[in-house]
Amino acid sequence: DTFRTLTLIDGQKISEQKSMSGASILIDPNSIERIEVIKGPASVLYGSDALGGVVNIITKKGSKKPFEAEGSVAWNGAGHGWAETISLGGTYKGLNYHLDAGYQSHGNIKTPLGYQKGTDFRQKNASAFLSYDFNEHFTAGLRADTFDSDINSSSWEYEQDPNSEFFVRIPKWKRDKVALFAEGKNLNEYLTRLRWDGYWQKNHKNMRNYVSQPQGPMKVVPILTPITESNLTEQVFRLTG
């Protein structure tokens, strides 16, 4: 059940308006270091939202070298689109940093039957991470990221039968986030770990649905919903040990 599966980024919840099943990820795969999955009884520690399990996305941090950079450029012939990414980071005298950015723009997908309408999309993102090890026991840092997309979808039946036309248009789906953390390790013989997290997050989405339904043998009635605009902003502070 996607409504009962909790999605986290670096242990912090992704907010989502319940206009569709589950929560949108809204993160570039290039920013992901690994993904942890928690199933079974342990997931109930995260609350009722996690009865189906927990997916925790761990983002990239700076490498162990003082400086490291990489980039990529890819061409997608099916959608005549480009995707570019760049990232850099490192560690120097207790300072750990990582920056990355990406941009994609793709047209409609080409299939043996022609171009599939409503499959074009655009996406841009950027993130920055910075932390400092004050000593072997205490670390503090921050992360800021933004993800902005423009996506569409349509049913193939539209190409075969105009009476079943359908599409969804999401010209704006954006997530902005700023997070702070402080963590202590091996503070004494009784307290091995203490962590504080605080973050501000905003999810902004515009969405429009269009469907044409046949009413009788010859009549087709189009139904176009107005643009639904929703904003969800939250501030969370949490202390764990």
Label every model-predicted segment.
Residues G53, F67-A69, W82-I86, L95, ...:
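Hydrophobic, lipid-facing positions within transmembrane beta-strands of outer-membrane proteins
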Residues L8, G22-I25, V37, D49-S72, ...:
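N-terminal periplasmic accessory domains that precede
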